[in-house]
Amino acid sequence: MAPPQRHPQRSEQVLLLTLLGTLWGAAAAQIRYSIPEELEKGSFVGNIVKDLGLEPQELAEHGVRIVSRGRMQLFSLNPRNGSLVTAGRIDREELCAQSPRCLVSFNILVEDKLNLYPVEVEIVDINDNTPRFLKEELEVKILENAAPSSRFPLMEVYDPDVGMNSLQGFKLSGNSHFSVDVQSEAHGPKYPELVLEGTLDREGEAVYRLVLTAMDGGDPVRSSVAQILVTVLDVNDNTPMFTQPVYRVSVPENLPVGTPVLAVTATDQDEGVHGEVTYSFVKITEKISQIFCLNVLTGEISTSANLDYEDSSFYELGVEARDGPGLRDRAKVLITILDVNDNVPEVVVTSGSRTIAESAPPGTVIALFQVFDRDSGLNGLVTCSIPRSLPFELEKSVGNYYRLVTNAALDREEVFLYNITVTATDKGTPPLSTETIISLNVADTNDNPPTFPHSSYSVYVLENNPRGASIFSVNALDPDVDQNAQVSYSLAEDTLQGAPLSSYVSINSDTGILYALRSFDYEQLRDLQLWVTASDSGDPPLSSNVSLSLFVLDQNDNAPEILYPALPTDGSTGVELAPRSAEPGYLVTKVVAVDRDSGQNAWLSYRLLKASEPGLFSVGLHTGEVRTARALLDRDALKQSLVVAVQDHGQPPLSATVTLTVAVADRIPDILADLGSLEPSAKPNDSDLTLYLVVAVAAVSCVFLAFVIVLLALRLQRWHKSRLLQASGGGLASMPGSHFVGVEGVRAFLQTYSHEVSLTADSRKSHLIFPQPNYADTLINQESYEKSEPLLITQDLLETKGEPRQLQQAPPNTDWRFSQAQRPGTSGSQNGDDTGTWPNNQFDTEMLQAMILASASEAADGSSTLGGGAGTMGLSARYGPQFTLQHVPDYRQNVYIPGSNATLTNAAGKRDGKAPAGGNGNKKKSGKKEKK
């Protein structure tokens, strides 16, 4: 069997395909670098060895080199570290010109593996070229009649950089007539255009010097400037044109000298000198120039001599119109003379006055003139007349003389100049007449006072205005002239609130501007009534007055003031009582506030700002009533703290806050017991005092029944009472029966009283505040007038031993009685017009509790009489000590009655009692409790 034949050509083809595949795969992984232009020679471009996966020492082993198609070798390999570096300075503009991207491509050849690796290096442009104008100075000539928005190309600017480093914009020095706009061709350079923003006037400014700045967008920005000289050229492109080529007119031969015959008109659309047209005669004889004259500015042709039909009946005149530079136009004027009676009457004013006072009486002579006619016979007889509408008349004088006189009063303010036309007419056929105008000026007299356009003024000024600010301006008009019309302003003297009016406002005598000399306060001054006087400078001066009402407008500059509860002065916090059995909506108290502002600045709203137990209480938005929002629970704390904010509706709103302390308990003993459990006893004396208070309150229930029985017995046997008291001789004070009430009265008594316990924040002791009850009869003995009444139980009082005294009943104290408006009651018991409401009969209950506590304290001692010592208010037990409460301050100073400025006071001269002598220790304790 023959061996298989080999095909060497096929093997070479397979090898070539394998090599090409290897090179193609290597070429797919192209290496890219990016460097800025203008790098120094040998600058690092990229780590080519790392990117090829070789080591630096393998460069020579593998035969790694750069294969480039260009003649210039831009890059080279560093044999030491195998990095690609620049072979020299690279200028992007020289290499790629204006191409957006500059890419340099070459290959890295690994000879031993025959692998080619394409490398692409992007040369990034830097801002190394400044925009350059091809010309640094350029003159632009513009016709003065160039239309706005006209464009004028300027010199080109060249910047070889690309992108943001190339030319980006232009800036023109500030000028209102020109602006610069940038134009650019598609993929071409940018060039500026000068844009005319408005019309030019060569006579106003003939040359403009502008500075044009070209800027690129590099960092930093490079720029260059060029000077632009704009010259405005004058244009005369319109020739004067007559309105018609031939003018024809016919005039009578008796036309007076100087009478206009005809007016020719030529128009020139140019402006300035180019539009100024002058007129002149052309190609006329000397005789014609003596008869007619032409106004060079108006084109009016008039007679300069008498016309005579018999001498010449026709005239032909040549007229030329010419502008400043010399453009001209011509026309013909044909004048025909008509044959008429050529002698007209003539009027010659021989004497007269051109000015007359407006106060001149009727019959004053103004002028004397003469009339005559050159004709004879009837044609020479002349009559004169003036318009009947004028306040003048003609009077015949000697011969052909006439006098012009006034026949009515003159008023310069109505007519200050009269042009009196005197018409002279002959009796020819047809009659001829002539007119002469006599001008008469009417001189002013001071016969008109200054008048204000309004009968009165109302000025509104916000309060707190700055001093010296102008608040209003008045203007009086005087129809007179000169000195008679010069108006000065002043204010009538007056006083306001004990101060002169001039201390509030002043007025500028020349301008009539009213200034405020002080800052107005709406709460102190709400309006001013002023009288402004306007006087002229005539002789005698005339004046008029106008009323000016200045109203001060309110600003929200007063925060709400809280009237109830009053802010404490002794450091303690007033406590409101809310029973635990209170239902939702129970009225606990009411916050009463006022605002001195007015309008919506005084509208108040109340809100609960902070509460120790959220959701337990609510505050009425408009009433300020503090009510329970839900039923009270056992877990609710005894002491509840509420912060109520009162805010007005001003802009910006102002507010005030008040802190309320609410004690949650059904009875005062509960409060004392809870307070005793809240704070441990720090001193033995404090514990004893608390124990005494608890024992005294516990005895109330026992004493109360006996107290009611005694009151009922006294009411039924009141007629025996005085006899029994006189017979007893035991020192009991007599008590009128009318001072006691029965069981039903006590029940009503309980219902009409409320209580208020003022608890200090650091003590278990309480101040029981007794308000005035709402009945007139009060049990008060003589000693109660001489001692303080608040029930503050101290150790001194417990240690005081009663001594026998001669008791005597004092008459009722009228200072303790309220007027109807001052009586406390529920928040709804008073009319809506009252200034405040009393929350929930709190004083009444407090009064009853104090009376019962006083009785219980005396009963506990067992040595007092029923008349009572001072401070018991006539309710002490029969065998109790004389309980005086002499060391306690007068509670009535702490009682505030909303809606009234009344203060609970004792009778005059009986308020301050002297304290009994005691030990030093007892005095210190009393002082400490008074401070609390």
UniProtKB/Swiss-Prot annotation:
Q: Where is this region: Disordered?
A: 804-841, 902-932
Tell me the organism.
Answer: Homo sapiens (Human)
Chain intervals with Basic residues compositional bias = 922-932
This entry's Gene Ontology molecular function terms read: calcium ion binding
Q: Sum up the protein's function in the record's words.
A: Potential calcium-dependent cell-adhesion protein. May be involved in the establishment and maintenance of specific neuronal connections in the brain.
The main location class comes to membrane
Q: Tell me the keywords, alphabetical order.
A: Calcium, Cell adhesion, Cell membrane, Glycoprotein, Membrane, Repeat, Signal, Transmembrane, Transmembrane helix
Location of this chain's protein in the cell? Cell membrane
Q: Using the UniProt annotation, give the residues that carry a glycan (glycosylation sites).
A: N81, N419, N545, N685
**Where does the Cadherin domain start and stop, copy by copy?**
30-133, 134-242, 243-347, 348-452, 453-562, 570-682
Q: What is this protein called?
A: Protocadherin gamma-A6
Which residues lie toward the Extracellular compartment? 30-692
Q: Which InterPro entries match?
A: Cadherin-like_dom (IPR002126), Cadherin-like_sf (IPR015919), Cadherin_C (IPR032455), Cadherin_CBD (IPR031904), Cadherin_CS (IPR020894), Cadherin_N (IPR013164), Protocadherin/Cadherin-CA (IPR050174)
| Biological processes, Gene Ontology terms | cell adhesion; homophilic cell adhesion via plasma membrane adhesion molecules; nervous system development
Q: Where is the signal peptide?
A: 1-29
Question: Topology in the membrane?
Answer: Single-pass type I membrane protein
Can you name a GO cellular component term? plasma membrane
Q: Where is the composition biased (Polar residues)?
A: 806-841
Where are its TM segments located? 693-713
Per the record, ranges on the Cytoplasmic side are: 714-932
